[in-house]
Swiss-Prot record:
This is Probable dual-specificity RNA methyltransferase RlmN. Binds 1 [4Fe-4S] cluster. The cluster is coordinated with 3 cysteines and an exchangeable S-adenosyl-L-methionine. SUPFAM superfamilies: Radical SAM enzymes. GO terms for cellular component: cytoplasm. The gene is rlmN. Keywords: 4Fe-4S, Cytoplasm, Disulfide bond, Iron, Iron-sulfur, Metal-binding, Methyltransferase, rRNA processing, S-adenosyl-L-methionine, Transferase, tRNA processing.
Length: 430
């Protein structure tokens, strides 16, 4: 395994083929206590890891095929592995990363939110959504669908978390108000997707058996603030088995509040994922309040980086805009947004309007239907492609901006924070 990513424990020189030492098992744990997992590594790295464990390197391919291709972690189902070492080998390469704590469903079972407890006691949430056949191709969180819409049962999208909490501090977002606990490992991200893919494949949600077709990095956390783990996870999600889960890169969306250097770096990765920029205001005065990182990278810098991403990848950029009543829904802001999207992104720009989802204690609400309709009309009249997001999961606090695990972690409640003050908006919104 490469330097910096090798298992930390040194193996005994006299390790036999089927006997794994305590050092090898200890080496499967990172310094922060998060277990190393097969999904953290490329297939070549997995081969070297297995060889260091004293097993033939092709065992890595076999276990990878089970995890990514057959969507199983159960050693009893891996009958091509020797019975004498099967459980121990699987236990080292596929340690449990997520434990379900609570599951809530709505939309007649077509939307499911799961609260996960991680190995160190941190919590994250993910949301699985099934859309009927011929549903609007942009409704699922702005993600693009495969040509067949996912399956004959309709597209299935997973909203995945990349961090426990979030450090961006956006005042209208429950996760942003919770604060950052830690980054997730690549495998912790991939595990959310693998569980969802298995759930859909086995028909364990409404609509019967199907295929997970889309993944959006729009759950808890700022994906590009956890850059290396997110990019590694995207590769595991999109590479074909036994390397990964085989979901099309074009069906993966990575969102960001606008970390300009990370956007520019993402453009060099050779990935064809959709970039979604959480803009929420066309002017720096208001965006400084709604998205505090704007003080570091203002609107034009963010859109400039998004334009370069679109130019390099030839992929459409989705501009995310949460409509907040009497805050950012004024007609002149619609006109300003349209002008900026046309200037920077042209035909590769798309605006995804999001009716603000309620969060506990927040004084803000969604725009009125009339204001929303006028905002849409002005964007469309200016020649900008625009859609209004389907607000799936509101009933279970699983919609955009609502994810924040309300649980105790290391002595503090993760969601219970004071409602944001409106004072800072008094001048900016006018």
């Amino acid at each position: 395994m490469p330097a910096g990513r090798a298992v930390s424990g040194r193996l005994e020189n006299d390790m036999t083929t089927h006997a794994m030492t305590d050092a090898a098992r200890a080496g499967a744990v990172t310094r922060r206590g998060v277990p190393r997992h097969l999904a953290d590594f490329s297939l070549a790295e997995r081969r070297r890891w297995v060889a260091e464990l004293g097993e033939p390197s092709f065992r890595a391919v076999q276990i990878s095929a089970h995890y990514f291709g057959r969507l199983t972690e159960n050693p009893d189902e891996m009958t091509d592995l020797p019975a004498s070492s099967r459980r121990e080998l699987v236990g080292v390469l596929l340690p449990p990363l997520l434990r379900p704590v609570r599951e809530l469903a709505c939309d007649n079972g077509l939307t499911r939110k799961i609260l996960w407890r991680l190995s160190d006691g941190a919590y994250v949430e993910s949301v699985l959504m099934r859309y009927p056949p011929r549903h609007s191709r942009h409704a699922a969180l702005g993600a693009e669908a495969d040509a067949d819409g996912g399956s004959r049962h309709g597209r299935v999208t997973l909203c995945v978390s990349s961090q426990a909490g979030c450090g961006m501090g956006c005042p209208f977002c429950a996760t942003g108000q919770a604060g950052l606990v830690r980054n997730l490992s690549a495998a912790e991200i991939v595990a959310q997707v693998a569980v969802a893919a298995r759930t859909v494949a086995r028909g364990e949600m409404a609509g019967g058996p199907g295929r997970l077709s889309n993944v959006v990095f729009m759950g808890m956390g700022e994906p590009l603030a956890n850059y290396r783990s997110v990019v590694d996870a995207v590769r595991r999600i999109t590479e074909p088995p036994p390397e990964g889960l085989g979901i099309s890169q074009r069906s993966v969306t990575v969102s960001t509040v606008g970390l300009v250097p990370a956007i520019e770096r993402l453009a060099t990765e050779g990935l064809a994922v959709t970039l979604a920029v959480s803009l929420h205001a066309p002017d720096d005065e208001l965006r400084n309040v709604l998205v505090p990182i704007n003080r570091r990278w203002p609107v034009r810098d963010v859109l400039g980086a998004a334009a370069r991403y679109a130019e390099v990848t030839k992929r459409r950029v989705s501009v995310e805009y949460a409509l907040i009543r009497d805050v950012n829904d004024q007609p002149w802001r619609a006109d300003a947004l349209a002008a900026q999207v046309k200037e920077f992104l042209g035909r590769l720009g798309h605006v995804n309007l999001i009716p603000l989802n309620p969060t506990p204690g927040s004084p803000w609400t969604a725009s009125t239907p009339r204001a929303q309709a006028e905002f849409v009309r002005r964007l469309a009249a200016a020649g900008v492609t625009v859609t209004v997001r389907d607000t799936r999961g509101r009933e279970v606090n699983g919609a955009c901006g609502q994810l924040a695990a309300t649980v105790e972690f290391r002595g503090r409640t993760v969601q219970e924070t004071p409602a944001p003050s409106m004072a800072a908006l008094d001048d900016a919104v006018r």
